[in-house]
Each structure stands twice: as C-alpha cells, then as structure tokens.
C-alpha cells in the first residue's frame, strides 16, 4: 500500500489544527485538488481565523466537490498515521517539490 504524503499531511493538518505544521508548508508542495484544499486552509490562517475542525469543515457544505473529496479521499484510514513525524512529512514534500 502506497502512502500519499500530500493527503496524509492535509489530514494531519485538519485533525491537529497545528500552527507549527502549517508554518512549515508551502502551497507548492501540493498538486491538483490537494493544492486547492491547502489554499482553503491557508485562507483561514491569512484571515487570522481558527482553522475549523474536520467535522466543522464537513458541515460547511460550501464547495460540494471539495467536501466530497475530503470525505472520500482525505478522511480515510489510509491517510491516518500518527507515527510519522511532521518533520518527516514536510521534508518529503519539500524533496518532491525540489525534484
């Protein structure tokens, strides 16, 4: 089973609402709809608002396509792994971006 580090990182960010993790991430580390989702997360931080919990995001129902993506692709057991350190995730995303 392959781990999608972008999805795993987004799940970790939504679950933990970690400012420390967010501060280490760049928009360029993500591609496709993952980049769109990270942009939504970034908009909360830019407005100095608290990042909503995963449950709150799912209740908003503003962007149905993005909501379905979060439910079906991000909030899955495959994208949950609390043994991988945040620093490792960031380093791997950074390495992928550089290449």
Q: Can you say where each PLM-predicted feature lies in the sequence?
A:
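Noncatalytic partner-interaction/assembly domains of nucleic-acid and motor enzyme complexes
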Residues: 1-96
């Amino acid at each position: 089973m392959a781990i999608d580090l972008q999805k795993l990182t987004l799940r970790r960010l939504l679950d933990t609402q970690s400012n420390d993790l967010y501060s280490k991430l760049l928009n360029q580390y993500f591609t496709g709809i993952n980049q769109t989702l990270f942009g939504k997360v970034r908009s909360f931080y830019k407005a100095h608002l608290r990042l909503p919990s995963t449950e709150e995001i799912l209740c908003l129902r503003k962007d149905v396509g993005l909501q379905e993506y979060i439910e079906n692709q991000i909030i899955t057991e495959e994208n949950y792994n609390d043994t991988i350190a945040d620093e490792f995730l960031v380093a791997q995303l950074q390495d992928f971006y550089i290449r």
